[in-house]
Amino acid sequence: ARELRRGTLQLIEDIAPYRHLGIEPPPLHLLINRVHPVSANARLIQQALRDLFQGHTGIRVLATDVPAIEAYPRAATRGLPVHRVEYRQPVGRVAPAALATMRDLAGELLPQWQDRFAAVPGRPPQPLDTRRPHSQRT
């Protein structure tokens, strides 16, 4: 957490001179990725990061955390968006479905589009298969 803080603050200092040229740096949103959903240590680190950046103008730690679940590497391997790979939370798992996480993250970054994100279906549309008889379709 300290290394992230040091590096982030150094980056902000490095780009500060651009303000004199009229270039205002955009707000920085920090995403906590690959969070183990039931780890007490992960929760402590998350809270420490939030506390470290709480008073800094232009830096915000996002409230949405991306959990360390198998759906993300599986989606990457298949070349698909994760919300199409895991649209329902598996039974017995603490972490939310990837679709719910992506909706929360997108809504946090672009709150004016939250209703549109809520309408995104997780399941990809199924093409009509009219070449095979109905009895052979799956």
Regions found by a protein language model. Name each.
Residues 1-62:
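Conserved catalytic-core segment of NTP-binding enzymes
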Residues 35-36, 70-72:
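Short, internal active-site loops enriched in acidic
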Residues 71-106:
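C-terminal boundary of histidine-terminating zinc-finger modules
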Residues 106-120:
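Short, hydrophobic alpha-helical segments
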Residues 130-138:
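Long, low-complexity, intrinsically disordered segments
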